[in-house]
C-alpha cells in the first residue's frame, strides 16, 4: 500500500484453484484439477493464495479491504472447454515434472474432452477473488 498515493486504490485479483468443481464428479476433471494445482505449485505459485488476499492486505496495515468473489459456471459453449484447454497447455509440464506419463495425460485429455462435450455436465472456472482498498490521507509530517 506504500506505493499507492493518498486516496489511491490498491487492487489485486487472483484465481483460487481449490474452488474448481464439476457435476457430475468426473475422474478426468479431478486429474486436471490436481495437475493444474501441482504444476502451478512447482513453478512457485500457490493454488489457494487468492482466498488469503484479504489477510495479506490486513497484514500490511492496509485499511479494511473490500472483496468480491466471482465464479463462472458453464453448461455449454466455449467457456466449458477451459479445463480441457488448460490441461492441454500444461501437458508437457506434467510429463516433464514426472507427475504422470504422456499416455496418462493423453488419456485424461481425451476423457475430459468427452466429458465437457456432454450436454448434461456442469464445469466451473476457478473462483476469482478481487480485493481492493483505498489508502487514507497521508499524515506524515512531510505530507502536511
Where are these regions (language model features)?
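A short glycine-rich, Lys/Arg-flanked "PGG" loop and its adjoining helix->strand segment in the class I
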Residues: 1-9
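Conserved adenosyl
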Residues: 6, 108-110, 144
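Conserved catalytic/acceptor-binding region of the Class I
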Residues: 9-78
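A generic alpha-helix surface/boundary motif
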Residues: 34, 51, 88-89, 127
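Short beta-strand
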Residues: 47, 123-124
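Amphipathic alpha-helical interaction segments
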Residues: 52-55, 107, 128
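C-terminal helical/coil "lid" or tail adjacent to the Rossmann-like core of SAM-dependent
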Residues: 60, 64-123
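Core SAM-dependent methyltransferase catalytic element
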Residues: 60-63, 83-86, 126-144
Amino acid at each position: 500500500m506504500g506505493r499507492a498515493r493518498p486516496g489511491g486504490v490498491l487492487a489485486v485479483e487472483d484465481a483460487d484453484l481449490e474452488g474448481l468443481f464439476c457435476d457430475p464428479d468426473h475422474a478426468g476433471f479431478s486429474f486436471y484439477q490436481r495437475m493444474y494445482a501441482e504444476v502451478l505449485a512447482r513453478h512457485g505459485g500457490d493454488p489457494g493464495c487468492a482466498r488469503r488476499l484479504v489477510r495479506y492486505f490486513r497484514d500490511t496495515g492496509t485499511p479494511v479491504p473490500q472483496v468480491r468473489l466471482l465464479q463462472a459456471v458453464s453448461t455449454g459453449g466455449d467457456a466449458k472447454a477451459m479445463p480441457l484447454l488448460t490441461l492441454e497447455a500444461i501437458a508437457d509440464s506434467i510429463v516433464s515434472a514426472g507427475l504422470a506419463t504422456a499416455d496418462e495425460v493423453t488419456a485424461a485429455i481425451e476423457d475430459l474432452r468427452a466429458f465437457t462435450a456432454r450436454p448434461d455436465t456442469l464445469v466451473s472456472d476457478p473462483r476469482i477473488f478481487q480485493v481492493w482498498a483505498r489508502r487514507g490521507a497521508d499524515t506524515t509530517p512531510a505530507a502536511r
